Amino acid sequence: MSDIIQLLPDHVANQIAAGEVVQRPASVIKELLENSIDAKASRIQVVIKDAGKTLIQIVDDGIGMSLTDARMSFERHATSKIKLADDLFSLKTKGFRGEALASIAAIAHVELRTKTENDEVGTCLKVEGSEVVSQDAFVTPKGTSISVKNLFYNIPARRNFLKSDNVETRHIIDEFQRVALAHPNISFSLLHNGNELFQLPITNFRQRITNILGGKTNEKLVPVEEDTEIAKISGFVGKPEFAKKSRGEQFFFVNDRFIKSPYLNHAVTASFEGLLKDKSYPSYFLYLEVDPKSIDINIHPTKTEIKFDDEHALYAILKSSIKHSLGQFNVAPILDFERDSELDTPYDYKNKEADAPQVEVDRNFNPFQNEGSSKTQFSGGTNFRKDKPAEWESIYSGMQSETDTDIDIRHIEFESEEVTGNLFGAREEQTEKSTFQVQKKYIVSTLKSGILVIDQHRAHTRVLYEELLKNITVSSAVSQQLLFPLLLQFNSHEVEMLKEIKDSLEQTGFVFSSIKKEEVEISGIPTLISESEVEILLEQLIADFEKDVPDNGFSQTDLLAKSLANSMAVRSGTLLNSAEQQHIVNRLFACKEPALSPFNKTVFTTLSVDELDKKFA
């Protein structure tokens, strides 16, 4: 038998390696930015075209490279960062494997211009598909400029897997922000298709966070400081009242390197226990300095996962330091002596004029409406007519008729709490209760064959989901125009997300006047929601669209309807009167799929008389 094992050619091996290192344009940005930082650059400019698919250019004022080093930098495993295996445990640089440039050059057209301070002229090197096309002397300033064009030009399948420009731009912004936050001592700029997205001067940590996420971020931050033998912790956490629906503003940096750590994230979340609203996530920007010998970063191609020698101790220190900072903030205001006076002007309550009282008008009030109207009103402002009795009512006639069991529902003691607001705007009917609530979570009704138990939140979600989906698919969504446009503040990441789903949002009734860098202007909203709910709903939408669920086959329209319905539905823990309970039950069984919520969760269950008899046997 002849030999069949062969050594792969370098260009094939480089293409295979590129699959690990370069997954999308954002991966190229990350690798090249880290190279510039290792080159001791104080100013770095990033230029991209068509979300990096056509051009990615990084220009820095670092130390540059000699003629020989420029050529060697494109060889596999050629690096200036380490020489021995032991050097891996004392790393202070971003790169060390010598794979990035070789991998990038294998799948793109690369042009490198570089010059050291001592050289009179620089070097211009062109590489295409791992092959050096030319190497010439070139007049260029000190530093390095590297251009990556036509990414994945020789791997069409990989290029076809790239997402839309909006999605790829969002990933680029994410990587750019992570690097920029870790290095406030370096000036960064980002241009996309000639438009400036970021211009970040050299500053301190707090100012850099504010410059990236917006001017109002500064007032939301609580400083965290702790210095121990295991680690030095510094940075900021967001105040609990400013917690968000998404995890977009959560950053860990270890020795100036962005990392992802579910374990340390749990420590932060645990320190906010009892302070956050349901399904809200705190913002944090935490910098950890540890001995390089106590960590291992060589466990993942992206270097975002790190192993710590004493992870449990670090968990305890982190949790304790954040709790201390939050406690200090709650007891008395924190005096920040490093605060930059140019960030913002604090409120001066002594000299501030009182705001004019706001008059709230009920747009749905109709003095001529018959009190016995069959319409039922949701909090969002839309009226839903009570349908004629559906077929299910004849099947489950026990819901509206007197129960045939020995227990008289009229003599059950209901909760004596008053309903603070009538969810549907109709008077509670002074009739016999055919439904009642359990723990303000479940709606219980009697059947001829037993008992029906309904999850009120899931049921209402199903009702709203089908209503929204119908409006969107038949293009019948109605928009209510606002007298004064809403101006909402979002960070760059969230703005890019809104741009991505803007068309689908407009199908639900939203009207966007403009979407700028950190501000969104809305002149119209769906009739199902009120102005006060818009910002919360959009935050939840962004959070839902950020979740990358592999087996999620729903379209943007379905996901929008699901997210809006889930946000608008009545929550568990809400006290409902009989009319409200009955309305949800009636509308639920008029749905196409009443048994399951839009998230495939059980909406109701039944308990037969036979099952009850067995319980008392």
Curated annotation (Swiss-Prot):
One of its GO terms (cellular component) is mismatch repair complex. PROSITE patterns: DNA_MISMATCH_REPAIR_1. The lineage of its organism: Bacteria, Pseudomonadati, Bacteroidota, Flavobacteriia, Flavobacteriales. This protein is involved in the repair of mismatches in DNA. It is required for dam-dependent methyl-directed DNA mismatch repair. May act as a 'molecular matchmaker', a protein that promotes the formation of a stable complex between two or more DNA-binding proteins in an ATP-dependent manner without itself being part of a final effector complex. Gene3D superfamilies: 3.30.230.10, Histidine kinase-like ATPase, C-terminal domain, MutL, C-terminal domain, dimerisation subdomain, MutL, C-terminal domain, regulatory subdomain. This is DNA mismatch repair protein MutL. HAMAP family: DNA_mis_repair (MF_00149). It comes from Christiangramia forsetii (strain DSM 17595 / CGMCC 1.15422 / KT0803) (Gramella forsetii). Keywords: DNA damage, DNA repair.
